[in-house]
Amino acid sequence: MSQKLPPLKIYTSQLPLVSHKNMLENEEEASHSQLFTPCPVPPSFPKASKPNSNQPYPNGPVCIYPPNIYLYAKPTMPIIQSFDVVINVAKEVLHPFRTDGRHYRDSKHNLDIQVFDHIEYVHIHWDHDTQFALELDKLVSFVAYNAMQLNKKVLINCQMGISRSACLMIAFIMKTLNLNVSDAYEYVKERSPWIGPNMSLIFQLSEYQQIIRKNSSQGPYQSSSLKQSKRKSEGNLLFPEKPHSAQLPLVSPSTSESSMFTNLRRTRSSGSISNDAS
């Protein structure tokens, strides 16, 4: 004769509390992870473990001015070897090569250049307090000459790719596309949401804007590189047909504007920058 077991008592206080809202959120998160997978990274770039908001450029250099002008943080050797010209504007960042390479002086742009195999490496010793407004024009000209006339792939970097290198990239966009600081900042920010120069650097860009206007009083600026590219490609100024070497993937993650830039007011007419906050 079978023995009857006592009824099993379950105390609800011992069970984890799972609300209907949490169940829906978990289901939504699971379905989201199935639908969206990270884009593959080319073998020339080290894969980031988990991209997060504190890690800029998780997928490698970002193309700011197609097809061959890129912005990045401190590059590794495999990344450097993917470019023809590297411009490092961080004083504290040293090149990763084992030797000092071959040196020569670029008299056209007044720059000292190191050459490693096919790579031209320019080290500009800026820190976050450097007054660089007067240096920007020769660097912008150097970038335009190599990328747009010689059709080389150019990387601009600093330690984090946020401040100093971003300033040089913004300066290039200002002069090349004839934009004021606000619009050039927005152009770069849309392509690299991690940038965020401090106000001291922004004011130096504003000073550079006045230099551009002073030097181009006879109308909108066009560099000699742009003019030659125009003659060669019959009006296709911005996008040469064949890059010098293989293209990197375009990465344009979307994010909200930084709190610093929301305080900047567009001034298309005057070109100056002002703070909304008192």
UniProtKB/Swiss-Prot annotation:
Stored InterPro entries: Dual-sp_phosphatase_cat-dom, Prot-tyrosine_phosphatase-like, Tyr_Pase_dom, TYR_PHOSPHATASE_DUAL_dom
> What reaction(s) does this enzyme catalyze?
O-phospho-L-tyrosyl-[protein] + H2O = L-tyrosyl-[protein] + phosphate
Provide the Gene Ontology terms for cellular component. Answer: cytoplasm; cytosol; nucleus
Tell me a Gene Ontology molecular-function term this record carries.
Answer: MAP kinase tyrosine phosphatase activity
Offer one example of a GO biological process linked to this entry.
negative regulation of cell integrity MAPK cascade
What Gene3D superfamilies would the database entry show? Protein tyrosine phosphatase superfamily
Record field: compositional bias (Polar residues): 252-278
Keyword set, alphabetical order: Cell cycle, Hydrolase, Protein phosphatase
Pfam families recorded = DSPc (PF00782)
The enzyme class is: hydrolase
Q: The Tyrosine-protein phosphatase domain covers which part of the protein?
A: 60-214
Query: Where along the chain is the active site annotated?
Result: C158
Under Enzyme Commission nomenclature, its number is 3.1.3.48
UniProt region (Disordered), positions on chain: 217-278
Chain's role: Dual specificity phosphatase that dephosphorylates MAP kinase pmk1 on a Tyr. Has a role in chloride ion homeostasis by inactivating this pmk1 MAP kinase pathway.
Family label = Belongs to the protein-tyrosine phosphatase family. Non-receptor class dual specificity subfamily.
Name recorded for this polypeptide: Tyrosine-protein phosphatase pmp1
